[in-house]
Design a protein with these regions (language model features):
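ATP/NTP phosphate-donor binding region
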Residues: 1-78
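Active-site histidine-anchored catalytic micro-motif
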Residues: 59-67, 71-135
Length: 135
């Protein structure tokens, strides 16, 4: 198992939505603002991935876009951790796009990052664990 390095001030953190697009909805703007403020107070630099704030319908209908965000985060050497914005029962749909993608698999193995998420993001924890990453 590969254990990612701990975070330090100035590290970039990717924000992904692997299941639901709730974080991009107007009624959650205050939660997004609070999260960004808290991460910045910790000295971290939040990076919202391209699809993370798209509406709920788009996110639900496009698991490949959600998977692309996670792949992009792992391929970016500047990003040191990935935070899932929300859990949800739709995250499992990202797994085929990732586990059949050699670039993603190589990125996880060669660019280990802290990965955190709750609820059904456990599917992604298991996926990363199978690739040798301690989450």
């Amino acid at each position: 198992m590969t254990k990612p390095k701990k975070l330090t001030k100035g590290d970039k953190i990717a924000i992904v939505s692997l299941s639901r697009g709730i974080l991009g909805m107007p009624f959650c703007k205050h939660e997004l603002d609070i999260a960004m403020e808290r991460l910045k107070k910790l000295g971290l630099i939040p990076v919202i991935m391209p699809n993370a704030l798209k509406d709920m319908d788009y996110i639900q209908k496009n698991p490949e876009a959600r998977a692309s965000d996670l792949k992009q985060a792992f391929m970016d050497d500047e990003i040191k951790a990935v935070i899932c914005a929300i859990g949800g029962d739709d995250t499992y749909k990202t797994i085929p796009y990732l586990m059949e993608d050699k670039e993603f698999i190589d990125a996880v193995k060669n660019h280990p990052k802290i990965f955190t998420g709750f609820s059904d993001s456990t599917n992604n924890h298991l996926m990363l664990n199978k690739l040798g990453l301690s989450t």
